[in-house]
Structures are given as structure tokens and as C-alpha cells.
Amino acid sequence: MFRKEADLGKTVKIVGKQKMEVLAERIMDTYGNAVLRLAYTYVHNMSDAEDILQETLIRYLEHRPVFAGENHEKAWIFRVAANLSKNKIAYNKIRQADQLEDQLIAQEREDLTFVWDAVKRLPESYREAIHLYYYEGFPTAQIAEILGKKESSVRSDLRRGREKLSEVLREEYDFE
């Protein structure tokens, strides 16, 4: 009985898949718990340790390295797991730093919200000068250009705006 080439390809894929499953099962049975423990000693988080174990297995199956003996295989698997663990630690540090920075920025914005609310209640000329100077970071000469005023007028608006803002904050928020 002759098989079609397509059927033969399916058979080869099934045999290849079964071989990979057997190989994966052998690696998990032999090294799974030890790799999980190693990863956990690095990351101190079972979920991350399980991810590292899974990624180690995937790397093994992708590369399918040939070893001189079982000790070489074990060393390779542990080296990959250790490197993945170190990468995870570095990634987590970066992610935590980014989250902390985002939290600090949000907190800073919340802390200054009441100040900007008070600025909104200032007369328009003071509000414009204060906004452009403090929020946008323009120097007084550039603010004068933007608003079509003399630089001395902008400086006066800033000074008067600060005085008025100080009054508003003292009245509303008991600032001294």
C-alpha cells in the first residue's frame, strides 16, 4: 500500500511532535524541580520561577543541543535557567523603577493640583505670565514676545501674580 506525500508529511509531524513531547517529559522529570528551585532562589516568586522553568524547557527544545554526557546536559540547562533568572531580575528592577517613577510623577501632580487650581483664579495677565514661566519654562524675554508686552511688564505681572497667588493660598489652604 502506497501513501501520498501529504499523508507521509503528517505522519512525520506526528512522530516529531511525539518525540518532542517525550523529550520534554524526560527533561521535566529529570530536572524540572531542581530548575524550579534554582529559579526561585533568584526571583523569590513562584510564578516567575515557573515562567523561567517553561522558558528553559522551550530553549532546550528549540536548540536540542547534543551533549557528551548527562552532566553536560544538566550544566547547560542550569546555566540557561540561571541566565533567564538574572534577566528576569533585571527586567523586574527596571519595571519597578518605571512604576515608582510614574507613581512619584502622579503624586507630584496631585500635590500641585491645588496650586494650579489657585492659579486659574488669578486675573488673566497674571495667569498667563505664571503659566508660561513656571509650567512651560519660558524666560521673561520670550514671554514678552509671546504676549506682545514689554519684558518689564511681564516681570511685574509675575511679581503681582505671585503675591496674589500667595494671598489665595493663605486664605484657602492656611499657608504661611
Task: Label each PLM-derived region with a short phrase.
Residues R37, D51-I58, N71-N83:
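Structural recognition of an alpha-helix C-terminal capping motif at a helix-to-coil junction
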Residues H44, E55-H72, Y91-N92:
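Sigma70-family region 2
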Residues A129-Y133:
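A short pre-motif secondary-structure segment
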Residues A82, L147-E171:
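DNA-recognition helix of helix-turn-helix
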Residues I27-M46, H63, V119:
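Amphipathic, Lys/Arg- and hydrophobic-enriched alpha-helical face
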Residues R3, V12-R37, E50:
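A short, charge-rich alpha-helical start-of-domain segment used by transcription regulators
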Residues N87, I94-K120, P139:
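Internal acidic/polar
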Residues A68, F78-D98, E108, R160:
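Arg/Lys-rich amphipathic alpha helix in sigma70-family domain 2
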